[in-house]
Regions:
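Acidic, S/T/G-rich, low-cysteine, solvent-exposed domains in lumenal/extracellular/periplasmic regions
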Residues: 4-195
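An acidic-aromatic substrate-binding cleft motif
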Residues: 1
Length: 195
């Protein structure tokens, strides 16, 4: 509904192997997320949610719903999606991350990141397989200063201290003012709704 990329056949097959059923859901046509929805998955949206969609999504999350958001570099303004994310203490820092640590990127491609994978219930199966994760042309996820005490944010994927965020990509060299690493490129956010 927002120009998302289609899920790859291999990803869809992996979901099916794990017994996960998937179906599309148009948030503009529902007043609430179906109760049997275990998780909403947004795959690189290129346009914003409407205010109504953001309200439906927020209500779902406030009731303990789950969401996976894979986002990409975009010039599109997304104030409604940004509002949902900021309610959970994060924001997308637009720009492209450049990694100058040779262990953190593909050789000769400093924008093709090989982030450090931190131990977490989400990432541990991947770590046990000694997996590598390639993130081409990634942006950073910043932790906001103000977040509810019930919200916990854990970094899952981070770049090295030698990385930096380029908002002006006319040069990939570091320039004064570039946000420096380590930078988050994957986070897990949970909220204790029992409080």
């Amino acid at each position: 509904g927002h120009g998302e990329d289609a899920l790859s056949e291999s990803f869809t097959a992996a979901l099916e192997k794990e017994g996960v059923a998937q179906e599309s859901l148009n948030l503009t046509t529902v007043s609430q997320i179906p109760e049997d929805a275990g998780c909403l998955f947004f795959n690189v949206p290129v346009s914003d949610l409407s205010e109504g969609e953001a309200a439906v999504l927020t209500s779902y999350l406030e009731q303990g719903g789950r969401m996976v958001l894979i986002s990409g570099i975009t010039s599109a303004q997304m104030p409604n999606l940004d509002r949902v994310l900021s309610a959970y203490g994060v924001a997308a820092a637009q720009g492209m991350i450049v990694e100058s640590d040779s262990n953190g990127a593909i050789p000769s491609y400093p924008n093709f990141l090989l982030p450090q994978i931190r131990s977490h219930a989400i990432t541990d199966p991947f770590l046990q397989e000694n997996g590598l994760l390639l993130l081409p042309n990634a942006h950073a996820i910043v932790h906001l200063d103000e977040v509810r005490s019930t919200v916990s944010i854990e970094d899952l994927l981070v770049t090295s201290e030698a990385s930096y965020l380029k908002t002006d990509t006319s040069t990939l060299s570091y320039q004064e003012g570039d946000l420096t690493g380590p930078l988050s490129v994957g986070v897990a956010i949970t909220e204790d709704t029992a409080q």
